[in-house]
Amino acid sequence: MFLNYGTNRLVLDVPLRIRKKHSFSKRTALERALENRLDFRTFFEWFRNQEDFENEQKSIKRDWDYRDPALECVRKAALSMLDDAEEIKVRRNPLRMVVIRNDKEYRVDQLSDGEKCTLALLGDIARRVAMANPCRENPMEGEGIVLIDELDLHMHP
């Protein structure tokens, strides 16, 4: 896997709805990987789809503690970079992504620009690695090269 993120990666668009459906597969993990921008919309749609799949598996398996390995890896990656964040999830009505901090719920669009950029960047990398390694117990053990131009731009420490 090879990913490239340029200096124009500020997240300006936090979607409130999904306009078109994407196919998420090992092959599409590399889709637009060399473009110089972040796409929060695709990350949001993938996250929502994985949550739906995870909830379906909980019901089928009658295992209410079931966690989808790919989604769990992305959750951990995203949460590791957001101070005091306990959970990240999608609310359905109205449709939005939220971060739970200190028992309070914040919409992603309420986060600072640096936090949104960090979430989008780490979420996109983790999503692509998870999609590229669907058979691994821990998809984050996959390998790749990630180029980030001006790493500190729009990022929090």
Residue spans for each PLM region:
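A structural signal for short, well-ordered beta-strand segments and their strand-loop junctions
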Residues: 3-6, 87-90, 98
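Short secondary-structure junctions
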Residues: 79-86
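Coupling/switch segment of ABC-type P-loop NTPase heads
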Residues: 1-79
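Switch/communication elements of ASCE P-loop NTPase nucleotide-binding domains
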Residues: 92, 96-157
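Short coil/turn segments at secondary-structure boundaries
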Residues: 17, 90-93
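A generic secondary-structure boundary signal that marks alpha-helix termini
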Residues: 14, 83, 127-131
